[in-house]
């Protein structure tokens, strides 16, 4: 067994099916730089990094936890509509979402200007941090 936080290289075809489907649906045109499996006390987690520095993290069941892009917006199809509406409205003109994280309780996005906005599960803004 691995100690908490122990990583080992893996390949995309060894990820859970849901993770593989997510990657092929949203990032099939990108080139994978590497993939790692991390053994934690709560189970395995996975991270895939592409050559353009896009990073995607998955839970053990293959559901995505985090998508981050260095120079491009995250796929609009993974951003819940209330968050898209909040960001694309008159609040933040010219900004795009370059990172999105989710867990059981909150969603958090980082805009291209570095601003971080946290939402609860009902998509109410609960924190804005620059």
Task: Give each language-model segment a name.
Residues 1-130:
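Long, terminal "pre-/pro-" and other extracytoplasmic accessory regions
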């Amino acid at each position: 067994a691995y100690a908490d936080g122990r990583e080992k290289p893996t390949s995309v075809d060894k990820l859970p099916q849901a993770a593989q489907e997510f990657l092929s649906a949203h990032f099939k045109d990108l080139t994978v730089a590497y993939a790692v499996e991390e053994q934690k006390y709560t189970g395995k987690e996975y991270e895939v990094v592409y050559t353009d520095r896009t990073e995607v993290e998955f839970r053990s069941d293959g559901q995505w936890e985090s998508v981050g892009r260095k120079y491009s917006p995250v796929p609009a199809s993974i951003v819940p509509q209330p968050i898209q509406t909040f960001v694309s409205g008159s609040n933040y003109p010219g900004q795009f979402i370059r990172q999105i994280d989710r867990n059981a309780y909150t969603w958090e996005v980082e805009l291209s200007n570095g601003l971080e906005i946290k939402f609860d599960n009902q998509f109410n803004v609960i924190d804005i941090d620059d």
